[in-house]
Amino acid sequence: MSTVTFENIFHGDSADLGKLRFNPVGFGWKAYQSEDNNPTTYNGSDIRHATWFRVARHFQLRLGMRNSEKPRISFDGFKRDDLDKIKRTLQEYFNITLETRDTSLKGWNWGEAQVKGSDLVFQVQGKTAFDVPLSQVANSNIAGKYEVALEFNPPSNYKFDPKDLNKRPPDEMVEMRFYIPGKSMKKAGSDAGSGGEETELDEEGNEVSAADAFHSLIKEKADIGAVVGDSIVVFEDCLILTPRGRFSIEVYADSIRLVGKSTDHRVPFTSIHRIFLLPKLDDLHVQLVLGLDPPIRQGATRYPFLVAQWPKDEVVNAELNLTDEELAQYPDLEKTYEATTFQVVSRVLKALTGKKVTPPGSLRNAQGLNGIRANVKAVQGELYFLEKGLIFISKQPILIDFSKTDSISFSRVGGGVASARTFDMRVVSKTGGADHVFSAINKQEVGPISSFLQSKNIRLKNEMEEAIVDIDEPFSDDDEEMESPSEDERPSKAKNDKSKTKPVKKAADDDEDESDDEDFEDESSDGGSPSESDSDDDSGMASDASDPMMEELRKKTQAKRTKAKETSGSGSEDEKPKKKKAKKDDDE
């Protein structure tokens, strides 16, 4: 049996070179690096048509097949001189005529988009600029009034090997947008004459835009809307927080679909790797969180988490569209459900995906609820402590695993009243990644959080001050009199203070009397007695001694008063040198 062989040929999108061999029965391709393996073979009788293209990797032979699973097969790497040889081989062995198709090289981004068979073809002046297999279209959305966005899933058959960079996954296009203005036109009826066109109308009699018609055609041809098999159950009008919108959740045997007014998302069960069921802190709603890998996309935004929300008391009656034989394959499923919506959805997904539903941990906040309120930068959210990690629920949820956490530290930023009531929690990663800082946490949660993390053997660091004096608390007149020493006590008191070493930061109450004496001595260095107003001001400042901001303000105020007294001319000229001398003596 005679054969025809072509060397250095690529099969489809593969980066491996191989050889392509034809014989009267069929043809096959085998990579050079897998000589011991069996080649990929095809039956010659399955070929419907053949096309010759100019592509990036020289020339391409594209074969349309009768097999619905692989409607198109392509081989790249042919030379220009191989055209005649390919024509003779296909004609002789399979009685197939090779069609040569020109490629548009103008580089225009405007033309005509047509659906031909199983391909979306974009033509410029009658020549093909590019074509896209509809089998690779994962989703189609109306991105604007006249825009249609096609999304593509990256190939899942690539395995990344960090030791071999040649086998890394290639760069893939993930989205393509078409701008299609105008209204959709269709051929008019026979009464309007041949060749006439009229505006297409929907069921309600409204005009259909060209973008909507193109979107519907892509969904129909790419089988986006028609998942294989009937849906098992449908949950209508569900509020999805991430990505935000109202969707109907259609559950199938191998995936779920989120169907919205202008956006659809299909999530295979193989993409769901975590399921969380978390009650909100308002005690009125419950959130179902799905961790996705790969994440779903909406425009240029990736969503690695899908967050749905239902009222806590919402009840649903659901009947699964499964036969008794199919139901027997899922022991945890029931034929009918009558319970709260979040319980029914979580139980169905748990049974179909085989994933465990993770509840919140044993930590309770000051109000006895699961979770605490916190901020990440300027984003407010809810932080939940799980048995094996943390999860922060917001527009972009954050999941932290305890096994990858090096330490967690508590700190307080600033010295004002607001910062005294809250603290920050910093999570340091073992892998050297960016730290996660959760701020504006109520200080009442320090104890429960510390106890919970210590039970998980997490290394903790407490960098907060031990005590903070409330600056709003007034001092009584008796306290002012007790804190004001006599003139005879001032010098000896000052000397004793100078002889003492500065202690490490402790509670502000321990240093309050000493700071008052020093302030009084500095302010009364001219030998006079402080006025009544000065005493009142000083006593007020003394109560703020523990606050760094108030301490700085007090020093500035005293400096202004001293400067004002020196420039006012009060006292004789002979007393001024005495001031300096007294100050010098104090310094000594």
Curated annotation (Swiss-Prot):
Biased composition range(s): Acidic residues: 469-486, 509-525
- Keyword annotations from UniProtKB, A to Z: Chromosome, DNA damage, DNA repair, DNA replication, Nucleus, Transcription, Transcription regulation
Domain of life where this protein originates: Eukaryota
UniProt GO MF annotations: DNA binding; histone binding; nucleosome binding
Q: Does the keyword Acyltransferase feature in the UniProt annotation?
A: no
Spell out the Basic and acidic residues composition-biased ranges: 487-500, 573-588
Additional information: In contrast to the orthologous protein in animals and plants, this protein does not contain a HMG box DNA-binding domain. This function may instead be provided by the HMG box of the associated NHP6 protein in the FACT complex of fungi.
Q: What does this protein do?
A: Component of the FACT complex, a general chromatin factor that acts to reorganize nucleosomes. The FACT complex is involved in multiple processes that require DNA as a template such as mRNA elongation, DNA replication and DNA repair. During transcription elongation the FACT complex acts as a histone chaperone that both destabilizes and restores nucleosomal structure.
User: What name appears for this protein in its UniProt entry?
Assistant: FACT complex subunit POB3
